């Protein structure tokens, strides 16, 4: 038993989810509706009237609609005035951070009820725009600035070459990591297909998933008209699917308050602790692309909470915007290719309500622990392998007070090697550090992009024109990685470096 005061032990007591599939576009619920309903469902799940006492409200950033001060609008709808009322920045790790921070607030005695929620209505918003339907929602706040996303932090050459969006940046990690592990592109693709098929199996079992069907590895990795290549090696079925309408919420309280409210013990799930760390926002300022030092540090800290062994977790959620993320994560955790990487279904199949997927993953994890699992790992990630947060949750009450200082940034930074200087202009020999190939909607190659090291070991990006069939064939070969291969850099007429294989 623990000797921590029960009013300082945080517990997750309520989970709520809503999926909206309107028959008519105009009947679609706006994000504020989804948020409110998810929170009310979480309160219903807890079986105790807690929402009215919430002193902490964290709202995950959403992009499908814009409000002025959405956290205040939501608090008004709920009839509450929480001391901590927060609407955060963009980041797929943020739901895990908010759950962790709420737990810390309860452990400090600053609040006794905390709510975390997120929602997106991108499917309805997109359909309405395409059909010219005016939605009867809270008026769109055009005067509110759009939140800064990853593209805002990238170099002009990266933007010019099209490698400034998640779907075109993550392939750099995919190619570099698989080469580092000694895989051929064919082997790397097979691992992605098998892993993603496993995510789809979990989605097929999740009543809240957007796509409820199992996909075979071959269906996932084979390009077709419906599964087009977007950025090598990623097809549509390997990337996040943001066209969903979903809301998710969790309620936390103290163990003392949960017991006083008569909440059943079998409902309680305990946050044991976690960790966070970040990479530079500009991905070209990182030392390499075959691993992430912050990801490693965060997952190792989570393992330490589980006795130092990743196999101690009997339920895990590895963030899944693109295959390289859980592929890197499972190796750091010491887990094999037979890993069961999700309790939710993944951002492709469950759906990607942008920043708030991990809210749904946390709900699914609570269900899994209530159903018999003992120790769970929630790992969220944001940006371009940029922001990392892990949280360990348990069916058993903690033996130690929740640790307040949970950044492992120093551990991550300690492993940084020298970062090569970036140059926007280069000539001479160039060695491939990583690469991708960008495709148009019709399946045609637009151009390749190689990340290179120059002869004096500086870093640049270069284009491979669609007309250079020999170099593109070299990049797209399945039995030998082009990472590490040598070629010639020349400046094109538009002042962009171009690379041709030697």
Name the predicted role of every residue range:
Residues 350, 354-361, 370-373:
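A conserved active-site cap/scaffold subdomain adjacent to cofactor or substrate pockets
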Residues 96-104:
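Conserved phosphate-binding catalytic cores of ATP/NTP-utilizing and phosphoryl-transfer enzymes
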Residues 93-96, 294, 353-359:
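A glycine-rich, Thr/Ser-enriched phosphate-binding loop motif common to dinucleotide/cofactor-binding enzymes
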């Amino acid at each position: 038993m623990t000797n921590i005061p029960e009013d300082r032990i945080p517990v997750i007591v309520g989970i709520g989810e809503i999926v909206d599939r309107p028959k008519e576009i105009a009947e679609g619920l706006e994000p504020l509706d989804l948020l409110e309903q998810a929170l009310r469902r979480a309160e219903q799940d807890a079986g105790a009237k807690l929402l009215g006492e919430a002193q902490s409200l964290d709202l995950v950033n959403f992009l499908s609609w814009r409000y002025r001060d959405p956290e205040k609008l939501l608090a008004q709808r709920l009839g509450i005035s929480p001391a901590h009322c927060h609407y955060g920045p963009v980041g797929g790790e943020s739901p895990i951070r908010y759950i962790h921070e709420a737990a810390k607030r309860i452990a400090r005695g600053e609040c006794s009820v905390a709510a975390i929620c997120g929602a997106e209505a991108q499917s309805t918003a997109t359909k309405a725009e395409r059909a010219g339907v005016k939605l009867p929602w809270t008026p769109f706040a055009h005067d509110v600035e759009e939140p800064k996303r990853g593209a805002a932090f990238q170099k002009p050459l990266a933007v010019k070459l099209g490698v400034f969006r998640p779907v075109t940046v993550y392939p750099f990690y995919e190619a570099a990591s698989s080469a580092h592990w000694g895989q051929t592109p064919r082997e790397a693709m097979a691992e992605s297909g098998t892993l993603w098929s496993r995510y789809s199996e979990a989605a097929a079992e999740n009543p809240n998933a957007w796509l409820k069907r199992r996909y075979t590895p071959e269906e996932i990795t084979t390009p077709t008209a419906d599964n087009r290549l977007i950025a090598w090696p990623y097809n549509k079925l390997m990337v996040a699917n943001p066209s969903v309408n979903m809301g998710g919420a969790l309620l936390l309280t103290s163990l003392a308050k949960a017991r006083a409210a008569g909440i059943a013990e079998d409902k309680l799930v305990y946050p044991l602790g976690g960790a966070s760390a970040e990479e530079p926002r500009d991905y070209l300022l990182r030392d390499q692309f075959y691993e992430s030092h912050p990801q490693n540090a965060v997952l190792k800290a989570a393992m330490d909470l589980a006795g130092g062994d990743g196999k101690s977790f009997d339920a895990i959620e590895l963030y899944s915007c693109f295959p390289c993320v859980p592929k890197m994560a499972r190796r750091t955790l010491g887990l094999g290719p037979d890993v069961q990487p999700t309790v939710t279904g993944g951002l492709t199949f469950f759906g990607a309500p942008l920043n708030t997927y991990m809210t749904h993953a946390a709900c699914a994890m609570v269900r899994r622990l209530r159903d018999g699992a003992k120790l769970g790992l929630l790992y969220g990630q944001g940006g371009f392998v940029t922001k990392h947060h892990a949280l360990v949750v348990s069916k058993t009450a903690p033996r130690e007070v929740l640790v307040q200082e949970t950044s492992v940034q120093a551990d991550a930074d300690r492993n940084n090697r020298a970062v090569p200087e970036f140059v926007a202009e280069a000539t001479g020999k160039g060695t491939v550090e990583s690469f991708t190939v960008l495709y148009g909607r019709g399946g045609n190659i637009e151009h390749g992009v190689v990340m290179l090291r120059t002869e004096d070991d500086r870093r640049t990006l270069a284009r491979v024109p669609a007309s250079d069939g020999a170099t593109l064939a070299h990049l797209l070969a399945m039995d030998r990685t082009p990472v590490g291969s040598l070629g010639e850099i020349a400046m094109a007429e538009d002042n962009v470096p171009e690379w041709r294989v030697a």
